[in-house]
Regions:
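Short, Lys/Arg-enriched N-terminal segments with co-localized hydrophobic residues
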Residues: 1-11
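Positively charged, low-complexity intrinsically disordered leader regions
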Residues: 12-41
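Short beta-strand segments enriched in small/hydrophobic residues
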Residues: 42-51
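Short beta-strand elements in bilobed, periplasmic/extracellular small-molecule ligand-binding domains
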Residues: 45, 67-82
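Glycine-rich phosphate/diphosphate-binding loop of Rossmann-like nucleotide-binding domains
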Residues: 50-65, 146-157
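Non-catalytic terminal and connector segments of soluble metabolic enzymes
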Residues: 69-72, 94-97, 123-126
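Short, well-structured alpha-helical segments in soluble
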Residues: 87-99
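Anion-binding alpha/beta catalytic cores of soluble intermediary-metabolism enzymes, centered on
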Residues: 106-157
Length: 157
């Protein structure tokens, strides 16, 4: 424990290693996925990226690597910048109905000609990895933290 003083208030804080916590969480998830697989239940994450945003590409590659590390099947959909909103909605509809896909992540930002709100609202709330769908935001707002997206869940843990 470390003592920190801010504005005359003394706070006790514990310095943690993000790498250590993350490695432990990956091992825990790996075991959970393995247990599901042993029961004949497979897990899948669909990641959609539209365009060539380099920061988004890094994020998507990290998700793919993370899935591989813990045994989750990763489905990547790299679409060209000129993909229409209708085409993207069609893909999301297919993924919403695909039993191999448990989670859908549509990487933001989307090209300017695509309405992010329309796209995010089209993802099945039960498969909405980022919890951007109004149903999931509503659960979080009333204190129902049954499902939290990765970043807030990591911060709270």
């Amino acid at each position: 424990m470390t003592s920190v003083t801010r504005k005359g208030i003394r706070i006790m804080a514990e310095i943690i290693s993000g790498k250590v916590v993350s490695a432990a969480k990956r091992e825990e998830l790996k075991e959970r996925v393995k247990a599901l697989n042993e029961k004949g239940i497979s897990t899948g994450l669909a990641v959609i990226i539209v365009g060539n945003n380099s920061a988004s590409r890094v994020y998507v590659n990290n998700k793919k690597k993370g899935c591989e590390e813990i045994g989750v099947t990763s489905f990547e959909y790299a679409l060209p910048e000129e993909t229409s909103e209708a085409e993207l909605l069609s893909l999301i509809n297919e993924l919403n109905n695909d039993n191999r896909v448990d989670g859908i992540l549509c990487q933001l930002p989307l090209p300017k000609h695509i309405d992010e709100k329309v796209i995010l609202n089209s993802i099945d709330p039960a498969k909405d990895v980022d919890a951007f769908h109004p149903v999931n935001v509503g659960h979080i707002m009333i204190g129902d933290f049954t499902f939290l997206p990765c970043t807030p869940a990591g911060i709270m843990e």
